[in-house]
UniProtKB/Swiss-Prot annotation:
One Pfam family named in its UniProt record: EF_TS
InterPro entries referenced in this protein's UniProt entry, alphabetically: EF-Ts_dimer_sf, Transl_elong_EFTs/EF1B, Transl_elong_EFTs/EF1B_dimer, UBA-like_sf
Family annotation (HAMAP family): EF_Ts
Endpoints of the signal sequence: none
Protein name in the entry: Elongation factor Ts, mitochondrial
Main subcellular localisation: mitochondrion
Family from the record: Belongs to the EF-Ts family.
An example molecular function term from Gene Ontology annotations: translation elongation factor activity
Keywords: Elongation factor, Mitochondrion, Protein biosynthesis, Transit peptide
Domain of life, source organism: Eukaryota
Compartment(s): Mitochondrion
Organelle transit peptide: 1-29
Native organism: Cryptococcus neoformans var. neoformans serotype D (strain JEC21 / ATCC MYA-565)
Role summary: Associates with the EF-Tu.GDP complex and induces the exchange of GDP to GTP. It remains bound to the aminoacyl-tRNA.EF-Tu.GTP complex up to the GTP hydrolysis stage on the ribosome.
Amino acid sequence: MALLSAAPRALRLPRRLPLGAALPALRALATPAAAQKVPVSLIAALRKQHPVPLAQAREALERSGLDLAAALDYLRTSTSASAEKKAAKVSGRDTNEGLIAISLLGGKRVGMIHLACETDFVARNQVFLDTARGVAETTAFLDVPGDHEKPQIASSPYAFDPILDFPTESLLSAPLISLPAADTADGSLSPLPTSEPTTIKQSLLSSLAQTGENLKLLRAVSFAAPFPSTPDVRFVPGGYAHGGITDKEGKVGGIVVLSVTSADPEKPIASIIHGPGGDDLEKAAESLARTVARQVVGFPTKVIDRGDRAVDDEEVLMEQPFMMFNGDSRSVKDVLAEWGKERGVVLRVVGMRRWAVGDEIEIKEKETDA
């Protein structure tokens, strides 16, 4: 009966903890389950395909359950929406700086574009440079839409200027073409494989999001040699830009198109090109085309031939001293004539464009915001 007579023990309450000691426990109770750990290798793979800050890449992978494809979709959607909003906010800002970018492909195609931004600081930014180069490569690689009428302009002495305006609205919706850093040995122009097609507009929006400035694709032109080529004439494009890191982009840029025909009516140029020394002739013509483009940029060139136009001597390409050809004091016309005579061919400059960042562009509606 001892159990019945034993006095009941006092109820023991838990000892109070100091507030400082209790906080960690309270935080643990209030904190949700830890998010799954994101592998560093997966973050690196995502950033390689879609360059974003580290934290943004980690967030995208967490939200997509570590699914790389889903994370890419998440980033594209969120980045595009954010960039569109920012583009609308900065669209009214002046774009007086930028670059003229040129892309020459395989000695058969050339493209030139004018991409504008707000400040010279951004114009020298690597993101902006890469964007301008990509747009220029795309312009050179793609054909101008077939319904775009060939214009006739005063700077060409021929019926049609072979250099065509490329509508900026068409370029914006075109896929961005990524090409090798240099032409391949066989002259092929195969685009590099990409994980996901990106339009030029999306590329501009991405650059806008990274630079924070208003970007505009102001103008674009391109030339593509006829394919298949005719036996009687070869067209050779050339390009040069001044004031940039390379001779493919700068504050001033110019492109030209040379026609090369045989001096012997009985011997078409095709037989010369495919005969002994033909490769050397083609390489020499390509080098000369670049030199002529450099001449166009180095002088305030406006027209190829004077014709009946009231222009200064230094503005007429064929009348300028060909200073870019080893400092030659003879006119461009005379040098080209002698160059061709030595090789049994006739050279003509049949197309030309010279652009500068500071040009006043008359047709403002052709400016295209990012």
